[in-house]
Amino acid sequence: AAKTGSAEVAFMKALIVIDVQNDFVTGALGTKQAVAILPNLKSKIDAGIAAGDEIIFTRDTHGADYADTNEGRHLPVPHCIKGTEGWQVVREIDRPDCVHIDKPTFGYTDWAALLGGREITEIEIVGVCTDICVISNALILKALFPEIDITVDADCCAGVSPETHRAALTAMQSCQIRVVGA
């Protein structure tokens, strides 16, 4: 917190945990890299809660009609169907008392409404897949909040492959998103 005149202004960090769901970790689209980041994610989330950060979980969310969607035609692997075990956030990192956002697309399109009225001074992004949903949300957030520092912790992210993970980190750095842990 900082003093401005006689008023105290609270500075807040938002930790956004992107799509760390069973289907992306051990399920239909899981990878060994996604499994490997779970201890780092748990530590990061625990530290954020202890620091009083705003913790927000996103969930990739599809319906039974997934195969008929544009994404389903390009990636014909049913995953994260709402209500299934694969759709759930991985138990060891989930915090049911934190905000959970369901999003039907790679990027959440209502960040301005969710974060705009808060005294957020820093945003940190972690999760999966670095090269799809993490980068999509990082770029949306950067466009909406160009004066807020946005960081991606590479040690708490996993991509579809190590190569596309690294490419996404490089692309985000090019857009003035700070990458740590790489």
Regions flagged by a language model, labelled:
Residues W111-E119:
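Short amphipathic alpha-helix with an adjacent loop that forms part of the alpha/beta core around
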Residues I101-W111:
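Active-site catalytic loop in hydrolytic enzyme cores
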Residues G63, I101, R118-A143:
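Catalytic cysteine-centered active loop of the rhodanese-like fold, especially the PTP/DSP P-loop
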Residues E8-H100, T121, E147, T151, ...:
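Active-site acidic carboxylates
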Residues D60, F106, D155-C157:
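Active-site beta-loop-alpha junctions enriched in small/polar residues
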Residues I132, C157-V160:
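Short gly/pro/ser/thr-enriched loop/turn and capping motifs at secondary-structure boundaries
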Residues V126, T151-D155:
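Short beta-strands and strand-loop turn motifs
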